[in-house]
């Protein structure tokens, strides 16, 4: 499904809906109204209906949403109804933390390879994965079915890491490095900066004082 015309904010909210719905399913909830789902997701009911309308019709009037079916439908809409092979470049503190984070695999993102250029890290085993030299990246992409690259290098090495990923045939990148990277337009990039959340919290605290 082509989603170029769907706002990024909608995609991010859909990810929240999946997280909340998965928790509800785990708690034994089978059906939920749009009002209750909206409260759980900290949005209004009309926003949920608008977001879901991009992908079709969901829910039953007077009943609500069937939790299991809605999870499956949203996952299919986002393309996460299958497992994505991921490669991580940069096995520092953040890289190690992500490798040990089991939630990625549970949500359909399997980190299958870890790469670094530091000779002292190459050969080390982290969370069951042997750290491999970045020069071997291209050879591992097809072998391991790698499609998404994760950059956790220092800022000054981010572009070099991106080059390895693109040259190896990676289709998309999640960049945790505090640096912008230059990649072809057909390779989507998501930048992750934890400080943005601190800014938001600081602003909300300040606005209430």
Swiss-Prot record:
It holds the Pfam family Put_DNA-bind_N. Residues 16-55 bind DNA. NAD(+) binds at residues 90-95. Signal peptide: none annotated. GO terms for cellular component: cytoplasm. Keywords: Cytoplasm, DNA-binding, NAD, Repressor, Transcription, Transcription regulation. Belongs to the transcriptional regulatory Rex family. HAMAP family: Rex (MF_01131). Modulates transcription in response to changes in cellular NADH/NAD(+) redox state. This is Redox-sensing transcriptional repressor Rex. It comes from Maridesulfovibrio salexigens (strain ATCC 14822 / DSM 2638 / NCIMB 8403 / VKM B-1763) (Desulfovibrio salexigens). The lineage of its organism: Bacteria, Pseudomonadati, Thermodesulfobacteriota, Desulfovibrionia, Desulfovibrionales.
